[in-house]
Swiss-Prot record:
Record's GO cellular component terms: high-density lipoprotein particle; very-low-density lipoprotein particle
Protein location: Secreted
Task of the protein: May participate in lipoprotein metabolism.
Protein's name in the database: Apolipoprotein C-IV
GO biological process, one term: lipid transport
Primary localisation category: secreted
InterPro entries listed in its UniProt record: APOC4
Lineage, top ranks: Eukaryota, Metazoa, Chordata, Craniata, Vertebrata
Signal peptide positions on this chain: 1-27
Family per similarity comment: Belongs to the apolipoprotein C4 family.
Pfam families: APOC4
């Protein structure tokens, strides 16, 4: 049951990461459309052959996916998603972080005092 709860907590972060990566991929593919092809000597290396083969295999899938999900790239949809994500997960991040830092500091000080010899760390009245 605990594993299921952890997976459900990680789902919004995973969705955000996938969305951001998809946006980056869409922007990069548009930026590289006008670039010239590499010189012939670069095309002969094995790594470039692997890259070109992977591009041949993946480019149609990426294009189809981008076309199908075009409604998602609209600014209002993305802005709405980000606003909802912020409201649900990040709005109270500052106070939560401050509380966590204070609790961590107190815990660390308590552990330090418990390890310190009484002669060195004793409180003076």
């Amino acid at each position: 049951m605990s594993l299921l709860r952890q997976r459900l907590q990680a789902l919004p972060v995973l969705c955000l990461c996938v969305l951001v990566l998809a946006c980056i991929g869409a922007c990069q593919s548009e930026a590289y459309e006008g670039t010239p092809s590499p010189p012939p000597e670069q095309k002969m290396s094995r790594w470039n052959l692997v890259q070109s083969r992977m591009k041949e295999l993946l480019e149609p899938a990426v294009t189809r996916t981008r076309d199908r999900w075009q409604w998602l790239w609209s600014l209002s949809t993305f802005r709405g998603f980000m606003q909802t994500y912020y409201d649900d997960h990040l709005r109270d991040l500052g106070p939560r972080t401050k509380t966590w830092l204070l609790e961590s500091k107190d815990s660390l000080l308590n552990k330090t005092y418990s390890l310190c010899p009484r002669l060195l760390c004793a409180h003076k009245n």
